Amino acid sequence: RAKSEGKDPAKMRIGMAFENDGFSLDVRAGVLDVAKKYNMKIVIDDKLPADLSDMSATLTKFKALKPDILLVSGHSKGAATAARQIEEMKIQAPVVAITHCEAAKVHEKFPKSANGMMCPTQWLSNLPKKDAYFGTASQWNEDFKKLHPSYSAVPYQTAQASAAVLVFKDAFERANSFDQKQVRDALAATNMETFYGDIKFAPEGNNIAKPMFYRQIGADGSYKPIVSPADMTFPRKANY
């Protein structure tokens, strides 16, 4: 967003905290790559406590140093802790981004701090993608909400799980066998479109056929897809 407004990204300062697990450390590695690319300064680089119940030490540093961006990755419990303590400590930052917003239901439990939060996601319900089994992305989203009305915002992991079933079905059919190696080879050769997006695996096993996305939580608790920097509400201003 800074670059799109003619500002120097190198002047943006980052404060971040991550759970000490494979997923979150992968996220951290990605942040480090982007920060290096744009010469952005990381002023806080913390590990969340093992029980994910308290990140006040990080937030105290954040209030003192006043970085432009706060990043947190700690699965659902970490997201809930972050949203709760951001609200308790009245953290103001131009950008706040945390993983697992939907699964933690931060928009319902902590609406004040959730307002303006950026939430990375693997999937959007308005993607122009479809398949023969679940239909379009929006159809899958509507069907899921009918079956599980407790979800006001559908976590992308649920869509991911449905897509995984389609991948296995396709691989088993192409392998025409339950032999482990043949099925593995068929999975590795996957190249298909689903309601979740295109799926094709790199040798390392990650899906290289689709990008990541962001959604931003509004004051009404809705999740707005961020397709371009212009879609983003910036800076975030929470009303505590």
Task: Pin down the residues of each PLM region.
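Extracytosolic ligand-binding ectodomains
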Residues: 1-240
